[in-house]
Curated annotation (Swiss-Prot):
This is UDP-N-acetylenolpyruvoylglucosamine reductase. The gene is murB. GO terms for biological process: cell division; cell wall organization; peptidoglycan biosynthetic process; regulation of cell shape. Gene3D superfamilies: 3.30.465.10, UDP-N-acetylenolpyruvoylglucosamine reductase, C-terminal domain, Uridine Diphospho-n-acetylenolpyruvylglucosamine Reductase, domain 2. It is found in: Cytoplasm. Pfam families: FAD_binding_4, MurB_C. GO terms for cellular component: cytosol. Belongs to the MurB family. HAMAP family: MurB. It catalyses: UDP-N-acetyl-alpha-D-muramate + NADP(+) = UDP-N-acetyl-3-O-(1-carboxyvinyl)-alpha-D-glucosamine + NADPH + H(+). InterPro entries: FAD-bd_PCMH, FAD-bd_PCMH-like_sf, FAD-bd_PCMH_sub1, FAD-bd_PCMH_sub2, MurB, MurB_C, MurB_C_sf, Oxid_FAD_bind_N. It comes from Allorhizobium ampelinum (strain ATCC BAA-846 / DSM 112012 / S4) (Agrobacterium vitis (strain S4)).
Length: 324
């Protein structure tokens, strides 16, 4: 049963859409966007051609229409009922650029894959970016969640962030404005990040290459990189590793429907067949419940979950726990 109506929403935008150069798709299947390959429809998806096109669209959008922004879908779970309102998915052509900007500085578009900035830095003898080689996803998501791996994180490298607000106004945020913490930014949720300026340090290419090779080898050895996964499912609680807590409750390899906690790395949830978003979220909340009952620790999702549940299929937090 469809919970959204994209054609009706498109009609509300009026004739101004004829001036747009990007792509408008009513009832867009989100399972084609997310790495989990599961989930419902976006009521209306817009892929802007460039920044000006994005601004034009935002000025057409009625204030009461919900707005969601997605990147490459690497750490995203869209519920089976879909996402009401507009989903903006930035295009690689308009928002995927990479360029040097001053000594040891790189500007990256929001949809630029994380590993591309690592490669460009290496090619130009700029150190400090090798950790990005082990992070799936794009720069926009890294800026939003302070993505990190292998001892590095986004907050260490970012200088400023370009963003557009709901009304189409451009903003430039400093690192302090971003309010970074562990896998978190306190920047306003309504801002659409369009690029970031990063700074590294001079380093020999051979040393950078060795570091990137180590990152790649580690990731391929301990993570299910060839599976349909969204990356790390839960954040590491202070003083603990999420995977160890999951392992202690027997969560490694646990399956619900077509969803499984990976046997290779049990903080990675994978779609092993035709899992629904319900299967995946139910599994995650079951794990949270088991960990809480044993240790009293409430694992926090690192995977972003969006959209509506199907009627009668709502997933409750901490499944199986009678009281918190």
């Amino acid at each position: 049963m469809k919970q959204v109506d994209g054609e009706k929403l498109l009609a509300r935008l009026g004739p101004g859409v004829d001036a747009l150069r990007g792509r408008l798709t009513p009832d867009a299947p989100m399972d084609r966007v997310t790495w989990f390959q599961a989930g419902g429809l976006a009521e209306l998806m817009f892929q802007p051609h460039d920044r000006d096109d994005l601004v034009t669209f935002l000025k057409l959008l009625p204030d009461d229409v919900p707005l969601t922004v997605v990147g490459v879908g690497s750490n995203l779970l869209v519920r089976d009922g879909g996402i009401p309102g507009v989903v903006i998915r930035l295009s690689a052509k308009g928002f995927g650029g990479l360029e040097l900007e001053g000594e040891n500085r790189i500007r990256a578009g929001a949809i630029c894959p994380d590993k591309h900035i690592a490669a460009m830095a290496m090619d130009n003898n700029i150190g400090g970016f090798a950790f990005y080689y082990g992070i799936p996803g794009s720069i926009g998501g890294a800026l939003r969640m302070n993505a990190g791996a292998n001892g590095g994180e986004t907050a260490e490298r970012v200088i400023e962030v370009e963003a557009v607000d709901r009304q189409g106004n451009l903003h430039v945020l400093s690192k302090a404005d971003m309010g970074y913490g562990y896998r978190h930014s306190s920047a306003p949720e309504g801002l659409i990040f369009i690029s970031g300026l990063f700074e590294g340090f001079s380093q020999e290419k051979s040393a950078i290459r060795a570091e990137m090779d180590a990152v790649r080898q580690h990731r391929e050895t301990v993570q299910p990189v060839k599976e349909k996964t969204g990356g790390s499912t839960f954040k590491n609680p202070e003083g603990h590793s999420a995977w160890e807590l999951i392992d202690e409750v027997g969560g490694r390899g646990l399956m619900i429907g077509g969803a499984q906690m990976s046997s290779l790395h049990c903080n990675f949830m994978i779609n092993v067949g035709h899992a629904t978003a319900y299967d995946l979220e139910y599994l995650g909340e079951t794990i949270r419940g088991q960990v809480f009952e044993q240790s009293g620790i409430k694992l926090q999702w690192e995977i972003k979950r969006l959209g509506l549940f199907m009627p009668g299929s709502e997933v409750k937090p901490f499944m199986g726990v009678t009281s918190e």
